[in-house]
Amino acid sequence: MRGKIYGAGYEIFIIAFFIGLYFDRTKPLVDDKSKRKRFGHQLMYWGNIEQRGGRHPYGRLREYIFAALIARTDIDLIALDKGDITARSVVDALMDKMEQYANFGFDFMQEKLEEDPNYFFKETAFLRVFTSFLNENKEETDEDDDVPESLD
């Protein structure tokens, strides 16, 4: 994927992450670390721009990413508190989960581009991707509503 199509590299990473998160799908990175790409822009600086050109900083988004990673990563916080595991190992687990969600999201986007090279040039492309999660959740909820609640 060419990042310039989408804007700053970290912005497309955020989108890819949320695609993986909402599909609840991960894809491991390649084992050969020399083939991995780096953005070179630390997470703590993502979205830290001054308002210009109608853009606003989105620091809260980083907080939501962190909260989602804490919720979806298998971490024993009690063991961390007791010192049985290191903070470094927890950070590594969170980073690995974030990268795997994003990796799935990048694959998802690549498939869409292979089907239609102009897919993401449509104004509503990402809106359609993310609203598709709402439709899936509604269908699951509707199916659950058909079954009466147990009186036991």
Locate the predicted segments by residue.
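Short, basic amphipathic alpha-helical segments that act as recognition/interaction helices
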Residues: 5-31
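Charged, low-complexity intrinsically disordered terminal regions and linker tails
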Residues: 26-152
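Short amphipathic alpha-helical segments and their helix-coil junctions
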Residues: 1-3, 44
